[in-house]
Structure formats: structure tokens, C-alpha cells
Amino acid sequence: MKKIYLEVKVVANNEVRNVAFAKGINRAINLGNVEKILAMMKVKGYRKAEMVQVVKAEDVITTGDIRLVDINGQDINPEDAAKYFLVLDGQHRTIAASLYNEWAAENGEEAINVPAIEVEL
């Protein structure tokens, strides 16, 4: 069985970073929703008006009470947090975009970066 390594970039305020999720805080991923979004992306591309909401990971990891993981579920060390945006809203779109990028690479299509809006906590 092929192991899938997911990868996608998020862009907020012209800054490109990797994706982070808060372990135990972000809701569980519903793969049915991801598949529906992915199917739409394959037909229409990513609708740029559907921005995900993010914060800079280093702004939330400093207190130590939030555990961040990357899109593959690997822990993010505090010293690496500045390479990530924590996705607050848009987990399903982000996962679908990473699967789209894998499909795009196999089909000669252009990969996408997920548009995001940075919010304040």
C-alpha cells in the first residue's frame, strides 16, 4: 500500500507557510466532506474567495498548552513554529487542496496554494 505524504502551502498577507493543526482542538476530518471538496476542485479549481482562517503558529505555541501537528500528524517543535500557519477554520479545504496537489502532479495540472486570511486571537 502506498503511503501518502500530504503537503500544501497556505498564503496569508503574501506570506507562504506550511499547515498546522491544533491536536485535540481542530475538529476531526470528515473524509466524505474532503472527497466532495476535492471533486469540486478537480472541476472548478480552488475558489479563491473561500479563504481559510489562520494565525501564526508561533503566536499560539508559546504558552505550551496547545500541541501543534503538521498536515501528516507529526508534532511541530516550538523552534519550527514560525514555518507554519495554524488553521482555525478550513481544515477540510486544506486537506482537499493537498490531495488536489497530489492529483495535479500526476495529471500535469498546476498545484495550488491555499488562500488564507490571518485573524487575531
List each model region and its residues:
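Short alpha-helix boundary/capping and kink motifs at helix termini
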Residues: 1-88, 92-101, 105, 119
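Charge-dense polyanion-binding interfaces
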Residues: 107-121
